[in-house]
Amino acid sequence: MENGLVAPADVAGMKVRIGAEANVEEAAAIARAMATHAETDVEVYVGDDDEPAATGEADLSPVEDDLGPTDRERDLLAQIEAIEAGGPEKYKEQLPEEGKRFVRDRLELWFGADGLTFEDGRFAEFDADDELAADGLLTGAAEFEGRDVHVMANDYTVKRGSMAGKGVEKFLRMQQRALKTGSPVLYLMDSSGGRIDQQTGFFANREGIGKYYYNHSRLSGRVPQICVLYGPCIAGAAYTPVFADFTIMVEGMSAMAIASPRMVEMVTGEDIDLDALGGPEVHTTESGSADLVARDEEHARELVAQLVRYLPDNSDERPPRTATTPPTRSPEGIDAVVPQDPNEGYDMQDVIERVVDRHSFFELQPEYGPEILTGFAHLDGRPVGVIANQPAHRAGAIFPDAAEKAAQFAWTCDAYNVPLLYLCDTPGFMAGSQVEKDAILEKGKKMIYATSEATVPKQCVVVRKAYGAGIYAMSGPAYDPESTIALPSGEIGIMGPEAAINAVYARKLAEIDDADERAEREQELREEYREDIDVRRMASEVVIDEVVPPSTLRDQLVDRFAFYEDVEKDRPSKKHGTVL
């Protein structure tokens, strides 16, 4: 347009065309003036030129004046600074000796220099005679690995992170808001429990500490709850870690127990230190209450960052997909990894690394019930939960602790819409007097129940042995998997050949006097039985869906999970099951 007429502004700003006689200085002056007046970027074109002769950028910074900050605001900022300094300096000075960060420094590690996006309840207990910074408990929201999360963090410099009235109120509000937003919750725990001298008003009240665990229960399966322990969590404080979906302890600093060593000695006479009572080794190898142990605070954050890659924000969403990568090891080697001898051990991790995306297997509870592997992985970028028998431990037989571990993992995956991959190579549930005392039937029931109830897509692979009720627990044909496929090394039967022949033919074999003849007949019977349980026979009877070449297993699983991605399964109409 000629003579200073203006073209309509668009999202990129305003374009102005002036007469051809104007020079660059005039164009620049016009651009600056119009950008200031219109509060938008301006391009000025001279004559018929295609390129602007000058541009003006709008200055949208606030107009400076002399109205602030006031003394009132400066006083408030000073008060906030004092609160954020935490408890007494002497307690802060002790933290490095224990390998710990001050809680607000910890938040910077997790969320960057600005820490929390916003904080709630910072002034809790500000007016108390004995001022307690934020009542020793920080709550708010933050962005973590690109996601909005609710956050709770104890301040150990304030009464050793203990809990009392105002802090309890903050904790409860944070949980209740998580139910509304559907965002994950991070609990950064470092608490010695409830303040015994202040228990009136927060212990047994309707809105007291007991409500924590009510809210934990309501949040369970709704949004991921992740807990990291940075210190001793005793009594009531120890329940948050076990209610969380995932719990990480930090080596050398964290512990959890229903009572302190002093209380244990008073009640039972047992003299025990905190680490032996409830340290990381106890809870990752014996109780199963913790999933992982971090080397230090930085490692704890890294582990949680890895973990959330496999999880959705809530139960209404699917877990996020990532770009696919080839497996760490070649699928061509799968058949060579699985021994010809069905009784020879091998590492199932080697099979997993040849099936899932490169370096994507994230194992949980590796030291607890190690005869079953549980963990997340990506398969063609799709998150899956892996439940795999581990022949390198206890021949892959399922013991009570492993059954409980697998049940909990399957239940969690189903809650958060993570498909399940079962890799079966087990002689079945372990037998004997000790496992009966350890509740093998009860805990085996839980594993079978969790597998039965899962409505996410499931794929079962018979890698080698699938004996007894092991094939039930590992989502065999009767448990509504989308597919049951087998490798040529697979066998499906009530029991293995050795046990079966001994059970059925022991008396007849004993009647053969010649030892060589008896051994020969026993071997013949074993071979006949082995043919009966061979997966080709099972495929012939359409017990399983397919026998696949091992080198194609990854491709088979990628295609099957993709095809059944949107499968819908209904549970019978009922309030809930009775298995817990």
Residue ranges: model-predicted function:
Residues 19-24, 396-398:
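Short, glycine-rich nucleotide/cofactor-binding loops
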Residues 2-6, 11, 21-22, 29-42, ...:
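Polar/charged, Gly/Pro-rich intrinsically disordered segments
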Residues 39, 51-580:
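Ligand-binding clefts of soluble mixed alpha/beta catalytic domains
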Residues 27-30, 443-444:
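Well-ordered, non-membrane alpha-helical segments in soluble/globular domains
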